[in-house]
Amino acid sequence: MKMANKLVHLTCGASVGVLLAGMAWAEDRVLRVTNWGEYIAEDTISNFEAEYGIKVIYDPYDSAEAIDAKLLAGNSGYDVVSHAGSDVARLIKAGIIAPLDKSKLDQISNIDPAIMAQLASDWDPDNAHFIPYMWGTHGVTYNEALVLETYPDAPIGSMDMVFNPDHLKELSKCGVSFLDSPGDIIPMALAHLGLDPNSTNPDDYDKVAAMLAEIRPYIKTFDNYAYQRMPQKEFCVSTTWGPDGLLAMSGAAEADTGVVLDFFLPEGQGKAQLWIDGWVIPSDAANVEDAHLFLNYMMRPEVAANDSNFTWYATANLTAKPLIDEEVTSSPAAFPTSDQVDLMYTTAVLPPKVERLQTRTWTNFKAGN
């Protein structure tokens, strides 16, 4: 999803490359799309532009909270937004997401019915607003040799590696990074304590805050891209999204420096999170017609497979899976097994009061308060 060298190619190539080819854009056909950085194949946008004569203004983002703020403020300027299902559920309730016209989405039958059912159950009733794109989980990416060299008693495979202050103190000597994502870390911490990851009980957040305060001194950075620097031994332990763990492992192997990385996800019932990312159309979108065209295009099997092969994230497109590299589909970091998925939790839309409590817990954690 987030290999830094790819972002430059994507943002430049999607617009400049096509212009250099001398394409004349259809009059007034401009589509504004925002998505996580490095979360789409390099040629997906340019191929769409070439096929339909539509100019795409593609705007990568690196913070879910930032895109939420734009959407909630209104007049975001976007026609298509990539976002997490759990976040979209909140935006749907606020009237910020437009319902889909499924008569214009004949490729929707390619999406995995199990994922559609999960979405309808948890975040988008009747699948009225959201087109699934990728799905996955989170866990810990680590350098076993460096971990054991630094701390021979490290509990590899246990989330105590990142949530127990005694262990983390030792591992901090070789570098520990956390995702800069409260929507992942706070529920993960609740689950680690044996609490409901969707808890609405303030006492539970007090317990999480106390645990996080104890480990805060031993975290080097909060960075969603820290996994990219693990092959250089900047960190020995990082909480990551699963597919980024796979990217880190591959990057280390390609560097051929002797660094070997591995990944594990939280084990046990209700310990690991299942997330689903997808595409929505804001209610104030200026180009709804071409937004539907783009969503339908993204659900083509060959397009979905190309995106998955580039990002190494698990596509929600069932018909695309046979077209995806085996290195990706065979890795539990990218494609968790069905048995693992059965044990996972999904995050719920929490009452505003609890959301504020989560935000305060996260802010204090990062600040070391």
Label each residue range with its predicted role.
Residues M1-C12:
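Bacterial N-terminal signal peptides that target proteins for export
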Residues A98-S109, D160, A255-Q273, P282-D284:
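Short beta-strand->loop
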Residues L20-A26:
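Sec/Tat signal peptide C-region and signal peptidase I cleavage site
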Residues C174-A189, L193-F264:
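Ligand-binding pocket segment of bilobal, Venus flytrap-like solute-binding proteins
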Residues A89-W135, A154, D160-F163:
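Hinge/lid segment of periplasmic solute-binding proteins
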Residues D277, P282-L343:
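Mature extracytoplasmic/periplasmic domains
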Residues E27-L91:
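Early extracytoplasmic/lumenal segment of secretory-pathway proteins
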Residues S338-N369:
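Conserved C-terminal helix/tail region of periplasmic/extracytoplasmic solute-binding proteins
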